[in-house]
């Protein structure tokens, strides 16, 4: 069957955001054997949306619209589709109750514009949104079927995975069950991991294997098709074993929505390993990330932001002579910062950060030159030097993420 994607949003046309949703859906449809015939991007304009629907309906079996389901006046995708197919919109009771409960919980008044998010086309099936308020739509006609989905990726992707896939399987009798497995790796570079698993990737058609790279970790997503869920799981587990035989030493977690930092903090909580930090260039960003994880208070009593040299000495005992002899961006200072923080708060481990975020150099140290230290209660200390590339924000972020990576490598792994 042929499908067409219509992305709705003036912000996409203006280049203010990247349309990752269309890419996500196209890749998924390809795995299902659904051919994406075309993609159209239109602004928040009723005539343009209806024109796109008319063109798409003439040449495609399935038309998917993405975006334009919010509460504002320019969110008009449902209204445009209703006018195009000649149907009325009415509030879906369950969706409207979800919106009502949400605003009541937030102690905010429910306005008419927010009720718009619960509108459903007469004769259509609702596609429920587990992560938002905008109700999706599936509408069947003799010539063309329509799926209407919200634009925020945090809502769109779960709806596609959890709601649209089963709906498509049921509606079109897709002959196979589709199951996915997501594996997460850290401590290995993009090129190295790709080279190690290249033979497996090249020789596999079921499951399909997709690699996604981020600055600090790598995700491998496996998607299998089979006649049953059990058979699909067997295929996935077989390929997972093949991959782990090659890169298992870098594997840290499995699951669709895994945050590396959450994983590390939760492992510390599980093992009752207390943590503190002494931060210079990162300015508290590491500690802020730690406390984003629920339950972090059980292992994180607090930390230190020691931006100035004198504060490093005053709060965590870094010797002025150490800074003078080695400069503040050095292994020796990272060691004393980590050791001082660990002893001061009597934690099991402590992480330290000292370096140059930029944009200028500091005492011959170039932007991106960072030392991270990790001190343990037993007196051992690990330090590592990094030379990150990027702007000030990126350098600070990479430093924070590699602090978590050092904990994983030296404490958890």
Swiss-Prot record:
It comes from Pediococcus pentosaceus (strain ATCC 25745 / CCUG 21536 / LMG 10740 / 183-1w). It holds the Pfam family CinA_KH. Belongs to the CinA family. Gene3D superfamilies: 3.30.70.2860, CinA-like, MoaB/Mog-like domain. PANTHER family: NICOTINAMIDE-NUCLEOTIDE AMIDOHYDROLASE PNCC, NMN AMIDOHYDROLASE-LIKE PROTEIN YFAY. This is Putative competence-damage inducible protein. InterPro entries: CinA, CinA-like_C, CinA_C, CinA_KH, Competence-induced_CinA, MoaB/Mog-like_dom_sf, MoaB/Mog_dom. The lineage of its organism: Bacteria, Bacillati, Bacillota, Bacilli, Lactobacillales.
């Amino acid at each position: 069957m042929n499908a067409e994607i219509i992305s709705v949003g003036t912000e996409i046309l203006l280049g203010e955001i990247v349309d990752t949703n269309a890419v996500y859906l196209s890749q998924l449809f390809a795995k299902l054997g659904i051919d994406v015939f075309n993609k159209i991007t239109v602004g928040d304009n009723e005539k343009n949306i209806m024109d796109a629907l008319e063109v798409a309906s003439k040449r495609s079996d399935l038309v998917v619209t993405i975006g334009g389901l919010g509460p504002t006046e320019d969110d008009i995708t449902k209204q445009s589709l209703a006018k195009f197919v000649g149907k009325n919109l009415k509030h879906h009771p369950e969706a409207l109750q979800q919106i009502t409960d949400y605003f009541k919980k937030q102690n905010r008044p429910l306005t008419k514009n927010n009720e718009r998010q619960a509108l459903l086309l007469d004769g259509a099936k609702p596609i429920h949104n587990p992560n938002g308020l905008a109700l999706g739509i599936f509408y069947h006609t003799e010539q063309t079927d329509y799926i209407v989905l919200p634009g925020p990726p945090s809502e769109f992707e779960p709806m596609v995975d959890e709601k649209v896939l089963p709906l498509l399987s049921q509606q079109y009798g897709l002959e196979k069950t589709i199951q996915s497995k997501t594996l997460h790796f850290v401590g290995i570079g993009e090129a190295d991991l790709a080279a190690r698993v290249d033979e497996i990737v090249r020789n596999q058609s079921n499951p399909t294997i997709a690699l996604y790279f981020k600055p600090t970790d790598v995700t491998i997503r496996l998607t299998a098709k089979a006649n049953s869920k059990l058979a699909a799981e067997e295929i996935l587990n077989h390929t997972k074993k093949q991959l782990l035989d090659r890169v298992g030493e870098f594997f840290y977690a499995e699951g669709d929505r895994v945050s590396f930092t959450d994983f590390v903090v939760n492992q510390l909580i599980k093992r009752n390993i207390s943590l503190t930090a002494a931060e210079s260039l990162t300015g508290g960003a590491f500690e802020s990330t730690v406390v984003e994880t629920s339950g972090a208070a059980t292992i994180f009593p607090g930390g230190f932001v020691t931006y100035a040299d004198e504060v490093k000495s005053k709060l965590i005992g870094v010797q002025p002579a150490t800074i003078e002899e080695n400069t503040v961006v050095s292994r020796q200072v990272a060691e004393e910062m980590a050791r001082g923080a660990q002893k001061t708060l009597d934690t099991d481990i402590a992480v330290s950060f000292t370096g140059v975020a930029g944009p200028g150099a500091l005492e011959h140290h170039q932007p991106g030159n960072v030392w991270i230290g990790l001190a343990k209660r037993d007196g051992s200390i690990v330090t590592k030097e990094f030379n990150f590339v990027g702007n000030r924000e990126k350098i600070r972020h990479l430093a924070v993420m590699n602090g978590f990576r050092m904990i994983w490598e030296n404490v958890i792994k």
